[in-house]
């Protein structure tokens, strides 16, 4: 892959992704799969005016060894320095960049119950800080190819060829393969905004999904809860793009108002393992049954993370004609696969979808119907059979 094109991708992440402000600190989290690209991102952040850029490294084999050998009480414990780090985030509000390259099977063979308990304890400990940061800083998730991930996507190719093909797929689907990715995203954001404005003008009350694969589902929406997509704004008015790529327009549904069965159309990578060929059944908004051909126990563990994990936090609509769907690739990565087709998310909803949310407390957002949870996990339900997958738009009464 040409370095000049990767430099443009890095610039896209710094400029359109987190939109680094003059003097603002930046935190980058990455795996050591593409070291030179991480350097490019750091460089572009400084060119954009960043104060100080700090990189936090993650290495999947170390993470796996930690979960395998570390005692649960130690895994669950939060250290003083970690709390101080979050306090510092709340005070300074750095932009945050997450560069994904994880192996979809990174934690295969690890005790998932142990992982769940540790993650739940730590998530609860840090939730107050995350709530304080919510919508007060820019963040962006983007991706680079790791060898294990590339081989999962292109199993018939050599390691080098698989990585090269995944690079090409990432840049193509991220609209970063052209001469000016920054301008391409400016135009893309305009298109997404037009779609959001149209959907919001309909005052949609309910979405209905039906497919020949077994999906037969309805979900109620919240009056005054908008569809968003593409670029977002912090409460301070700073624009940023949280996901690169992104094709979706999304909203948060009414907690407790969903019934029926949805059948997933793509695998879900969760906690370093793949959940495959699964379905989820709702009654009165809550998950009452799940089934999966692979890792059903992991799926059940996910919806048991806390009370809100069994309720929906997002309904997203994705156009059938999009770069990711047109690529024909299953990425085994939610950042990409969720933008290939319509999807739902279990767990935490989006307060920012509510009209006037800046003047609402967290409790007031919950009272209006926004779900709260420690998790937010997207899963794909869009069918390629357009004749058998429909979305019925039922407007609120005037």
Where are these regions (language model features)?
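Dual-mode signal for accessory low-complexity, basic/Gly-rich regions
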Residues: 289-358
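Residues in well-ordered beta-strands of folded domains
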Residues: 98, 142, 210, 220, ...
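Active-site bordering "gate/hinge" segments
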Residues: 1-259
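Short, glycine-/Ser/Thr-/acidic-enriched flexible segments
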Residues: 33, 102-104, 146, 214, ...
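Short solvent-exposed loop/turn micro-motifs enriched in small/polar/acidic residues
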Residues: 11, 200-202, 271-273, 308, ...
């Amino acid at each position: 892959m040409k370095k000049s094109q990767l430099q443009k991708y890095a610039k896209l992440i710094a400029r359109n992704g987190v939109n680094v402000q003059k003097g603002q600190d930046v935190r980058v989290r990455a795996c050591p799969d593409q070291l030179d690209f991480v350097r490019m991102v750091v460089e572009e952040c400084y060119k954009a005016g960043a104060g100080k850029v700090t990189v936090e490294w993650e290495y999947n084999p170390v993470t796996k060894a930690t979960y395998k050998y570390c005692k649960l009480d130690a895994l669950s414990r939060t250290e003083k320095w970690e709390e101080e780090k979050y306090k510092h985030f709340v005070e300074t509000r750095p932009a945050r960049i997450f560069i994904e390259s994880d192996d979809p099977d990174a934690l295969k063979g690890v005790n998932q119950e142990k992982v769940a308990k540790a993650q739940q304890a730590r998530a609860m400990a840090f939730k107050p800080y995350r709530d304080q940061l919510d919508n007060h800083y820019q963040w962006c998730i983007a991706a680079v190819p790791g060898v294990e991930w590339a081989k999962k996507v292109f199993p018939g190719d050599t390691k080098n060829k698989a990585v090269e093909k995944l690079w090409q797929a990432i840049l193509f689907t991220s609209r970063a393969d052209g001469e000016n990715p920054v301008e391409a995203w400016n135009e893309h954001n305009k298109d997404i905004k037009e779609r959001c404005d149209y959907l919001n003008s309909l005052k949609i009350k309910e979405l209905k999904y039906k497919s020949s694969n077994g999906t037969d589902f309805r979900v109620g929406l919240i009056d005054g809860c908008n569809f968003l997509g593409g670029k977002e704004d912090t409460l301070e008015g700073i624009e940023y793009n949280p996901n690169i790529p992104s094709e979706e327009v999304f909203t948060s549904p009414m907690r407790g108002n969903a019934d029926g069965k949805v059948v997933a159309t793509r695998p879900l990578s969760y906690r370093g393992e793949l959940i495959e060929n699964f379905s989820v059944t709702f009654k009165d908004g809550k998950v009452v049954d799940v089934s999966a051909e692979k890792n059903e126990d992991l799926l059940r563990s996910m919806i048991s993370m806390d009370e809100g994990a069994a309720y929906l936090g997002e309904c997203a609509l994705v156009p059938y004609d999009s770069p990711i769907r047109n690529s024909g690739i299953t990425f085994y990565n939610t950042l990409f696969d969720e933008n290939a087709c319509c999807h739902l998310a279990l767990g935490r909803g989006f307060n920012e979808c509510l009209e006037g949310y800046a003047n609402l407390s967290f409790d007031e957002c919950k009272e209006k119907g926004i779900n709260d949870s420690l998790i937010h996990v997207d899963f794909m339900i869009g069918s390629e059979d357009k004749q058998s997958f429909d979305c019925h738009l039922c407007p609120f009464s005037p």
